[in-house]
Amino acid sequence: KVILNSGREVAADTVVLAIGVVPETGLAKDAGLEIGETGAIKVTADYRTSDPHIYAVGDAVEVYNSLTRKPAKLPLAGPALRQARTAANAIYGIPGTNKGVYGSCAVRIFGFNAAATGLNEKTAKANNIPCDSVYTMGMDKVGIMPDSSPIHFKLVYEVPTGRVLGAQAIGRGNVDKRIDVIATLIAMGGTLEDLK
């Protein structure tokens, strides 16, 4: 059971406490590095900080969201690894490109797989991107496969262009494959027409 601040008790089999991630920027502040509008360390496309001799990567840095075209926080291991490679290449003088992030992620919890990429409706609207969404339920494999499983899938797109902005999926089967396809479509600037 859960006991609320009001004293009210709520019966529950499982409780998930999700408190978010706050970047640890104390050392950066002490070093005089610029902190961005998100509260994370402001960096260039090659992860150089406001001190040209210091690079920063990972949960403590701002990333460029390719869809909102604004700085964002993205505390995920995959992007942090790519950031480290980009910074290492820059240190060694190897040119590279950083097109930003879409925020693709996947997790398995309580026997379900969930994955997402791009923007959800709330984030799109908060960034004044006119959008709508479509919800569908399909199977993770061809329906005649004996181990196929339903997937709940939501696709977010820009109105009126139809540009794909993001997707979320959940199910017991392989949802990440569907999200990978949408992430590729987003990277290509794809629209609903491209999904036909």
Pin down the residues of each PLM region.
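Short, hydrophobic alpha-helical segments
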Residues: 88-95, 186, 190
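Active-site-proximal substrate-binding core of FAD-dependent oxidoreductases
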Residues: 71-75, 90-117
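FAD-site-proximal beta/loop scaffold in flavoenzymes
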Residues: 2-3, 8-89, 181, 185
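A short alpha-helix-loop-beta-strand transition element characteristic
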Residues: 34-38, 94-105, 130-134
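Glycine-rich flavin
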Residues: 63-64, 95-99, 193
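Flexible, glycine-rich terminal cap/loop adjacent to redox cofactors
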Residues: 19, 110-117, 126-196
